[in-house]
Amino acid sequence: MIGELCRSAFCLGILLFASVLWGQELRLGTTYTVEDSGLLKVLVPAFERARSIKVRAVLAGTGQVLRIAEKGDVDVVFSHSPADEEKFVAAGFGVARFDVMYNDFVIVGPAADPTGIRGEKDAVGAFKKIHARRAKFVSRGDDSGTHKKEQFLWRSAGLVPKWPDYLSTGQGMVRVLLMAGELQAYTLCDRATFSAQRAKAGLEILSSGDPRLRNEYGVIAVNPARHPHVNRQGAQAFVEWITSEAGQHLISNYRIGGEQVFFPGAKSRR
């Protein structure tokens, strides 16, 4: 009898704990690329089922996501600009950064390829050709991880992207792809979003394969010492889950048109 009562009390405790977690939503700050690729729609429901924690996604470019997190307006960050994420942690806004996954960026453009970059393995060389021809180029211009990578490539080329047909939009990746398609322009895009939007954009991958185009994603719990109100338990649960075998398996198995667009990368801590 006592044993039954203990077991009942134990089970009740678990249920109450789970209900508390479910009642306190987790605010996940993440990027448009995770949403636009469709991956977020796979990860969030799986996490909610596994940990009984309700998730509310807050979407923005990486730079904006980190600024939102600095204010304590999200509990955990899932983004793709390692250098900025490391600065975020070093400044005391995040607990620690963990690698989650990676893919790559690609330079896409019209099939006619007026600059002749098709097959170019040197991304900086491709940007130099685009600049030399003053070709149409649509930029995110939004301080996102993709925009930061584009800026890195221009700096590496020793060039300033400023000519009449260089358009800085301040828009998300899908809108930029559609604009580039309408204008028959070039742009830099993460491979996953391009795979998801290829048919609508009407563009082609023209340059890829440069190691400098690697696109790494990390996860960071917002520091409760800086913002005591954050959902500390929920954030830690998300970090543990997405870097676990279960989370990594979902990432590895995610496909767009049969193509693997993300690769598990939860190996090291930054």
Language-model segments: which ranges?
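Short, glycine-/small- and polar/acidic-enriched structural segments
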Residues: 75-76, 95-108
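Short amphipathic alpha-helical/adjacent loop interface patches that line ligand
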Residues: 9, 44, 104
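Hydrophobic/aromatic-rich structural module bridging two neighboring secondary-structure elements via a short loop
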Residues: 88-96
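Bacterial N-terminal signal peptides
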Residues: 8-20
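N-terminal secretory signal peptides that target proteins for export/translocation
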Residues: 1-6
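Exported/periplasmic ABC-transporter solute-binding proteins
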Residues: 22-54, 58, 63, 67-73, ...
